[in-house]
Amino acid sequence: ASNFTQFVLVNDGGTGNVTVAPSNFANGVAEWISSNSRSQAYKVTCSVRQSSAQNRKYTIKVEVPKVATQTVGGVELPVAAWRSYLNLELTIPIFATNSDCELIVKAMQGLLKDGNPIPSAIAANSGIY
């Protein structure tokens, strides 16, 4: 079964959800993009590489746009006022078992879980204090 499927990137209680769908898979890089116009789209990429004889490296990138419009010649055009970029690198030894990898995923989910220090600091536009 393929895992290159669409998924909810931003879960905002249903109405404001952002879903990203597969858009490209070239040179070992999977790309998902939201249905917004290209200039306003949310984008996710993921690649897996053999980083050494002993390790696999996952490189995950997420682009979050600040959606805006710009008037050009009396026409409102969709633009991104700015973008936020997330880059995550994960290195896993090749001898890790599936249960080891499941534990790593649980640690990633805990790291970014609502209410925990790092997402709270980011959501409040502040630091760790």
Curated annotation (Swiss-Prot):
User: Domain of life, per the record?
Assistant: Viruses
GO terms (BP aspect)? regulation of translation
UniProt keyword RNA-binding present? yes
A GO cellular component term found in this entry reads: T=3 icosahedral viral capsid
One annotated GO molecular function: RNA binding
The protein's UniProt keywords, in alphabetical order, are: Capsid protein, RNA-binding, T=3 icosahedral capsid protein, Translation regulation, Virion
Positions of region (Viral RNA-binding): 31-104
InterPro entries from the entry? Levivir_coat, Phage_RNA-type_capsid
Subcellular localization is given as: Virion
Task: Kindly indicate whether the keyword RNA-binding belongs to this entry.
Answer: yes
What function does the entry list?
Capsid protein self-assembles to form an icosahedral capsid with a T=3 symmetry, about 26 nm in diameter, and consisting of 89 capsid proteins dimers (178 capsid proteins). Involved in viral genome encapsidation through the interaction between a capsid protein dimer and the multiple packaging signals present in the RNA genome. The capsid also contains 1 copy of the A2 maturation protein.
Q: How does it assemble?
A: Homodimer. The capsid proteins form dimers that assemble by group of 5. Twelve such pentamers are linked together with free dimers. The homodimers binds to the viral RNA via an operator hairpin, but also to many other RNA sequences in the viral genome; this interaction probably shifts the virus from the replicative to the assembly phase and ensures specific encapsidation of the viral genome.
- Membership in a protein family: Belongs to the Leviviricetes capsid protein family.
Q: What is this protein called?
A: Capsid protein
Question: Which source organism does the UniProt entry give?
Answer: Enterobacteria phage f2 (Bacteriophage f2)
